[in-house]
């Protein structure tokens, strides 16, 4: 996942619809369908979550789905945070660990910021530091899960729903990253 930051907000119907449009746009325009299919089919249950979410790219979403993103409060905050961080300005601090980590990646080596964020900062999207980031990611993951019948893939074999699979795999991802 590229830079992913977000705002916690109660979901109004307008926000929910707007976030659905953002999710559809992100899946369609910012993820390579063949790559996603390959990840879903070939990754083990333990690897599928990280292999997918580390491909989620907030920079792409901002560029290719900017209108949809700005209408979804969770995503709009992410755009504001990305802009502030890129300009070296203070953020509102709603996702302190994630924002600090992204800022450190930007200051260490701007040419490697996306890989730095993916390997070092993504965990903060799922560890409770940034609930809105987790919500955006859950929407994208769940859409992919449904499109590719992920729960019935032989290596995944999950009896529940895609959002519940996301929550279970997110917890496992955090536990593994914190080892």
Swiss-Prot record:
The membrane-topology field of this record reads: Single-pass membrane protein
Q: Which Pfam families match?
A: DUF5332
GO terms for CC? membrane
What's the domain of life for this entry? Eukaryota
Q: What is its main location?
A: membrane
Keyword Nucleotide-binding in record:
no
Its keywords, alphabetically, are:
Membrane, Transmembrane, Transmembrane helix
Q: Which residues form a coiled coil?
A: none
Residue spans crossing the bilayer = 11-27
> Where in or outside the cell is it found?
Membrane
Q: What does this protein do?
A: Acts downstream of daf-16/foxo to suppress tumors induced by disruption of gld-1. Potentially a direct target of daf-15/foxo.
- What name is this protein filed under? Protein dct-5
